[in-house]
Amino acid sequence: MGSVNYRHSHCKDILLLDFLGDLRRTHMNGTLRASDAGKSAVLMGWVNKRRDHGSLLFIDLRDRSGVMQVVVNAERNVAIHEKAETLRNEYVIAAIGTVKLRDANTVNPNMPTGEVELVADDIRILNESKLPPFLPSDTALTNEETRLKYRYIDLRRDAMQFNIETRHNVAKAIRDYLSSQGFFEIETPFMTRSTPEGARDYLVPSRVQPGTFYALPQSPQMFKQILMISGFDRYFQIVRCFRDEDLRADRQPEFTQIDLEMTYPQPESVWAVVEGFLEAAFKAAGEKIETSFPRMDYDEAIRQYGIDKPDLRIPPFTDVRDCFTEQNLQELAINPNLPVIAVRTPKVGELSRKERDDIKPMFHSKGGARVYEDFKRIGSKYPDAAAAIGKKCGMEEGDLIVLVAGSAQTGPQTAMPAHRKVTPAELSIYASAGLLRLALAQKYADRHGIFKKTGDPAKDYRFLWVTNFPMFEWDEGEKQWMAAHHPFTSPHEQDMGLLEQGVDSVNDPNSTLSAVRALAYDVVLNGTELGSGSIRIHRQDIQSKIFKALGMTDEVAKKRFGFFLEALEYGTPPHGGIALGLDRIVMILAGAESLREVIPFPKTARAVDLMCDAPTPVDQKQLRELGISIKK
């Protein structure tokens, strides 16, 4: 196996590099075991580490599968030993030799390949490497900006290799499961018309149609519905989507979702499919979950958790206003017409005075809600109320209870219409209590331990279906009702009368639109929304009515959605579906803290690709061709 050399004139030491030639890799580095002893092998990869012991030189050779120790002995071949002495971290090499059992005293039980080593007969240097800004083997992480700039180095790290492999395994399991259930994988266009769905669109100018723009899809929503109109019955796609929005830890401008749609479903039909592919996905990542997820009405979630994506590992809160007498509430300056919420955090233990004082700064009031953090003081003054509260909440020794209630000064706010299930004043109490519940649980996580993995899937992965969301939500800035999910979600059949009454009152905060429920559902895991879906509108008359309820004239609706409204007139079957965030699912399974840890080439919080230095200005010639001028 002779090597063909060429000289790098820029290398002061005239480093000789080798062509691969006809050399073929025989094994992945991390796959060799004691049973392979005596075999000839050709290994290739990066130099992870080199250790010089005089006439013996040890190289840890790394590839995707793991690390293999290569031994170069000067007594066997002085020239190969001298060549190996020039190796540095991250050089790419080929090692040709024989697999040998290690001596008993050199076996490394911490390595899968720790019983064997490759005794090298030849080393080929396939490429050199500059000194990297950090090494893949570094245990202390460098700052994220440097990691993103040199992403190709960062992705060599074991943790990132694990994350991306997990992503592949999860996506494959989902694809295989949905295919087995009769779903067709069908691609939808990336270049389509702009129909904003809440966030801003990324626009693509058309050169051949000057002054016009495509938009990158925020979701394939209308296309997948049109596929149902087209007769494909069951569709799925693991698809890239784009939203021009402000970023945070769980957002990226381009992201991947598991998108599916099916005809003639009940909500339960969609849920069964989702639970099936989630079970397959978690299994592919070495985790087990229990299916038949519990279900909770949106109103129930708000009343018990103060949020529409509750973390079921944390106890719900309890309305304890009936534990107080009217005089008690008056003395405590608590509004008797609003909920009095007891937030229970388990197994916190005795708090110091300072720790109790620290609770108030954690509280974020929504619309007049107040926190009463000293339950001990309330207990000493109102022992009967405290005993009743403890019993109603299921309080145990070491539990912390904090009360959240409305201030008496805010007034009863009873002038809400009867169709409202939760008034804004009540919602302010629930939302404030919900935020405090999460903050306290996170602050004392080391004490109660409810976030630690137990090995019991029923405790570690608390899935939930949240159902019957409001169809509309009030936008205080715009002073009108907006679609809570998107305008293609079907209202409940029982609420069509409320829709009819409110269709012309888009600017009235007391409209009956507030009580219209959507056939919408979210799947939640441990307080994180994994996905959102709904049964869709399949009748053109109802779809037009929804557009009208959102303040669109017939002309505006036709301009934005005319092609879709026309498609609905050609025998559209009932249909529904869902979309789940693949990035977020992988983030949970990999135990990562950010989506950037599970996406190969992510953007920063400023939507910048540091590796490619994108976005960038473009040539004036390109702008002229597109008919675009940039205002400075």
Where are these regions (language model features)?
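Class II aminoacyl-tRNA synthetase catalytic cores and aaRS-like
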Residues: 2-632
